[in-house]
Structure formats: structure tokens, C-alpha cells
Regions:
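Short helix-adjacent coil turns
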Residues: 20-21, 37, 41, 76
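Loop-to-transmembrane-helix entry motif
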Residues: 28-31, 37
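Single-pass transmembrane signal-anchor helices and their membrane-water interface zones
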Residues: 10, 35-60
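Short linear functional motifs in flexible/disordered or boundary regions
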Residues: 18-22, 52, 221
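Disordered, charged N-terminal biogenesis/targeting segments of membrane/secreted proteins
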Residues: 1-29
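Generic structural microfeature
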Residues: 1, 5, 35, 40-41, ...
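Function-determining sites in protein domains
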Residues: 59-297
């Protein structure tokens, strides 16, 4: 099974099942969270579940998608090396990564013993570069011998199961310092492939969206679980709540003025935003509801 097969295979899995599984799994204890918060850091780049895993750089014959993840931990964030055209285009990059996209050299890398990478002080034939067309922390370029990859941001490092990160920090990953750095906001289907409705490009609406989202309070996983699911009387009722919450998921694509794209989710019936790579949740207030009703419904 090559990396393209893995991509197609995961896209054929029912997204509702994956979303429900993820919502429930976030209530597990710390060791499970720390393991999968890193390993599964980008699956939301392929299918619509909340924990981020890419698995887009696996060797042929590799039957285990976990071992096919070309992950990199860098500056307190998790990334994955990607070369599948459909995925690159989904995130606003050209369908093929080439040498001319490599900017300033940042690090030499080495294999981490699997499909992933780690930084090294020694000179190697694997290098990490800035992405020249749009210098930011959301995208880097990786050269592994003669092969070039995009290295896409997946999520912030999680110190424990209640680590929380503000949306301001997610925006900064893509060099968004104000609403002027956002080109459009678009609702997408669960696979993040088809636009739903018309992209929001009105400057006033984008300014309001940015201002409201950076002001929202951030909840780590443990606090979110308590707020959302602790009031149910038994396990069966709680499981039904998890399913209903997952079924309510909708996706927003944010595109920067440089053309880079990333995604966050929202659950309007339950008043929550799923902060994507922040691995955090945000309570939707009345103003945010009004913006959603005005622009996305």
C-alpha cells in the first residue's frame, strides 16, 4: 500500500464514525492523549476528525498507516512531510514541490528510526528550509536526497491532556497578525474538498470574524470534556451526546492573503468551536452565532 492508497483509503472511511470516535477518545487519560496527540497530529488534514495525522509519505508495502507518518517536531509544533498533489492543493500549495520553493536553510535532519525526522547538528542529505513564497511557521520545505516535500503544520505540542492554545497563536503560525492578512473564510464539506455556499470576502465581515475569534476563551481537552459531557447520567447517555456532538460538526477554511489555507471546525448547536491545530475548544458567544447565521447559514 503506497501513500496515495493510504490517502484514498482513509477518505473512504465514514467521516461520522471517525468524528465520533475522536470526540469520545479525547476523554481518555493522559498517557493515551500524549501518545496520539503527537502521532495522530494530522489526520484532520485528510478526513474531518479533530485530532490532527497526515500519513502522506509512506513506503510501498507499508501496511500500517501510523508507521507511514513522516512527522517532525519543530519549535514546539508537530509537522508532517507531504507530497500528494490533492493534499498540497487543499492547503493552498502548488501540486508539486520543487527546489525553487526552498528559502533560507533552517536545519539538517535525520531519520527518527521510522518514517519521521528529527533535527541534528550534523550535516546530512536531509534539509529543512523556509517556504520562500510565504515565509511562516505553517509551511516549510524539506529535501530528502533528491525528493522535495512540503512540511505542513499539524498541531501545537501538548504538554498534558488539558493544554490549551488561543486562536491568536494558530493565526500567527500562518503570519496572520490582523484581519488584513485573511483573504477569505469559506465553509467546506467534512472532507474539506467542496465549498458550501459563497466564500466570505467582505472586509467588514472578515474583520468581525477575526476580532471575535481572537477574543474567545480557550478550553483544554479536560475542561472541555467536563463542560460538554459531565452532566449526563450514565455512559449510554454520554455516548449519545458524543454522537450528537460529532454529527453537528461543520468546517471552516481560512485562506491567507498569500493563498495558504487551514481549517477549524464548529458545532453551532452546542456552541463550540474546534480549534484545529490548537487542540483546544472555544465557546461560541451570541456575537459569533450572529456572524455564523449571517454568513454561513
Amino acid at each position: 500500500m503506497n501513500r496515495k492508497d493510504l490517502y484514498n483509503g482513509f477518505n473512504e472511511v465514514d467521516d461520522d464514525i471517525l468524528e465520533r470516535s475522536e470526540t469520545a477518545s479525547r476523554s481518555k487519560k493522559k498517557p493515551v492523549w500524549l501518545k496520539w496527540g503527537a502521532i495522530a497530529a494530522c489526520l484532520c488534514l485528510v478526513v474531518s476528525i479533530a485530532i490532527p495525522v497526515l500519513h502522506h509519505k509512506g513506503g510501498s508495502g507499508n501496511q500500517d498507516p501510523v508507521h507511514a507518518i513522516a512527522a517532525l517536531e519543530y519549535n514546539g509544533k508537530f509537522y508532517e512531510a507531504v507530497d500528494i498533489p490533492e493534499v498540497l492543493e487543499k492547503y493552498g500549495l502548488p501540486s508539486k514541490i520543487t527546489a525553487d520553493m526552498a528559502g533560507e536553510h533552517l536545519e539538517y535532519l535525520k531519520s527518527d528510526g521510522g518514517a519521521g525526522y528529527e533535527c541534528t547538528a550534523s550535516q546530512t542529505d536531509i534539509e529543512l528550509y523556509q517556504y520562500a513564497p510565504s515565509v511562516c511557521e505553517g509551511v516549510y520545505i524539506l529535501r530528502d536526497g533528491e525528493v522535495w516535500y512540503a512540511v505542513l503544520f499539524c498541531n501545537f505540542y501538548q504538554f498534558d491532556s488539558n493544554t490549551n492554545v488561543e486562536l491568536t497563536e494558530l493565526y500567527r503560525v500562518y503570519s496572520i497578525e490582523s484581519a488584513d492578512d485573511i483573504a477569505s473564510i469559506t465553509e467546506m464539506d467534512r472532507n474539506r474538498e467542496k465549498e458550501i455556499g459563497t466564500p466570505v470576502t467582505d472586509r467588514q465581515e472578515i474583520t468581525e470574524f477575526y476580532g471575535m475569534t481572537v477574543a474567545l476563551w480557550s478550553y483544554g481537552n479536560d475542561d472541555f470534556q467536563k463542560q460538554m459531557f459531565s452532566g449526563y447520567p450514565d455512559e449510554e447517555a454520554q455516548q449519545k451526546a458524543h454522537i450528537a456532538f460529532a454529527d453537528d460538526y461543520r468546517c471552516i477554511r481560512i485562506e491567507t492573503v498569500d493563498g495558504l489555507r487551514f481549517f477549524i471546525g464548529f458545532h453551532p448547536s452546542f456552541d463550540w468551536i474546534d480549534g484545529g491545530g490548537t487542540m483546544s475548544y472555544f465557546k461560541i458567544d451570541e456575537q459569533m452565532h450572529a456572524w455564523i447565521d449571517r454568513n454561513l447559514n
